[in-house]
Structure formats: C-alpha cells, structure tokens
C-alpha cells in the first residue's frame, strides 16, 4: 500500500527526514502519526524508527545543528529538536524483559518492533522515501478501516507489559473504536490488576487525552 503523506506533514518535520534519508533507505514514521494520517488527520507528534546506529544518529544530527537529548540511549531512543519541533527517533527494537512499565530492549527487526507495540493500528510503519505502508501484524490497515481496536499478540501479555494500555484502550473506545472480543475480555478480566498497577500521573495523561485537553 502506497500512501501520499507529505502534504499532511508540518514543515518542521522535513529537516529530520532529510538527515535520516541521507543515511539510509530504512526510515519510517510509526505509531500515532501514521494512524492519524491514514484517518485523514494532521498529527502533531512524530516518531521515527530506523536502522542507523545511535552513535551515528547523534553525530549527524549534532553536526547539523539539531539538539539531541541522549537520556534514552540505553533504550535505543533519542529526542531530537530543531527550531520548535521535537521528534523521537529510535532503532528497531525487541523487548528482552518488561516489568509492567519499563522494558529492557535490544536491537531488532521491523517485525520485532511491531510486535512490541500495543495495538495493531499503532503498529503501522510508513517508509518516508517510498510512501509504502508496512503492516507487520497483518491486521493494522484492516482494523483501522473498520475502527477495530486489537491488541498485538496476546492481549493479557500486552497489558502486563504496560498497564497503561488498559486505560489507552478506553481512550480509543471513546474515539469510536470497538475493542475486538479477545481484547475486550482481557481488559474486563484484568481491570483490577490494571487499576492497581497504574500510577496517577500516567492515568491523568490518558484521561486528559480522552477529554481532548
């Protein structure tokens, strides 16, 4: 599936794409920005994923006058800024361990990266050079068209990796998405566990997003 997306991007995103695309053909937008653009919206938050090593990314962006926050390097994530725009740039990752909030990660493939994400609609990758939408789970595009919310893999496993995903499911339900039966059953059966393992600060963020704040 090829998607014409560039007219949906704010101008501030193009400098990041220019640097990344000069280094590799493997540059993807992923997650909410892809989901929202496919729904016809203009997203504000952008996450990139690439195969360029962290050290090279840091060197190239700093040489180009970008600000680079390296606090997430151990998790293979950088926050990179230019002007008023900040984006997240990560490598393809695979979870080695997870305690319900924090994951220990290692380098992985695009398939690994997709299968560590929460919902199929958030596991879509858009190649910025070709416009190709890559759907490693095989369900993301169809679920988005049908407004179906489906956890990637086993719902209870995904929730236990990050209990905030239970609250996030509610947020998407409030936006008109329908939880598929296995996902809905998991949220219902695990609700007390989700509640007991969620910090007020992170829940507040999800509730504010639900309310459009």
Where is each model-derived feature located?
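Catalytic cores of the polymerase beta-like nucleotidyltransferase superfamily
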Residues: 1-213
């Amino acid at each position: 599936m090829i998607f014409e997306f560039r007219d949906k991007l704010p101008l501030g995103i193009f400098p990041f794409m220019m640097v990344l695309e000069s280094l590799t053909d493997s540059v993807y937008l992923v997650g909410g920005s892809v989901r929202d653009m496919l729904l016809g919206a203009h997203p504000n938050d952008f996450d990139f994923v690439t195969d360029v090593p962290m050290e090279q990314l840091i060197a190239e962006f700093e040489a180009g006058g970008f600000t680079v926050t390296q606090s997430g390097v151990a998790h293979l994530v950088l926050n990179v800024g230019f002007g008023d725009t900040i984006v997240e740039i990560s490598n393809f990752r695979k979870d080695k361990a997870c305690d319900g909030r924090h994951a220990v990660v290692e380098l992985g493939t695009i398939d690994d990266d997709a299968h560590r994400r929460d919902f199929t609609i958030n596991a879509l990758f858009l190649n910025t050079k070709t416009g190709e939408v890559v759907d490693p789970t095989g369900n993301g595009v169809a679920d988005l068209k049908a407004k179906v919310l489906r956890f990637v893999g086993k719902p209870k496993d995904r929730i236990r990796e990050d209990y905030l995903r239970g609250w996030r499911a509610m947020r998407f339900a409030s936006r008109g998405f329908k939880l598929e039966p296995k996902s809905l059953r998991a949220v219902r059966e695990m609700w007390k566990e989700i509640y007991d393992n969620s910090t007020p600060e992170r829940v507040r963020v999800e509730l504010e997003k639900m309310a459009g704040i």
